[in-house]
Amino acid sequence: MMSKLGVLVTICLLLFPLTALPLDGDQPADHPAKRTQDHNLASPISAWIDPSHYCCCGGGCTDDCVNC
């Protein structure tokens, strides 16, 4: 009887290992710094945009803008 139980437990552990269970440290609420790290998505996107294709008409014009 005990050997059957051991075989059953071994099969269950092989099919569903304990590492598949989520741990408390894996919850996103425990890592607020990782969530707020990527809050500024405009900086990588602005590197792809060529400012010479746009014109600035107003007080917020910078040196990299083209006048209208």
Curated annotation (Swiss-Prot):
Expressed by the venom duct. This is Conotoxin Vx2. The keyword Magnesium does not apply. Belongs to the conotoxin M superfamily. It comes from the Eukaryota. The cysteine framework is II (CCC-C-C-C). InterPro entries: Conotoxin. It is found in: Secreted. Disulfide bonds join 55-68, 56-61, 57-65. Residues 21-47 form a propeptide. GO terms for molecular function: ion channel inhibitor activity; toxin activity. Residues 1-20 form the signal peptide. In vivo, elicits a series of symptoms, such as being sedative, tail stiffening and twisted jumping, when injected intracranially into mice.
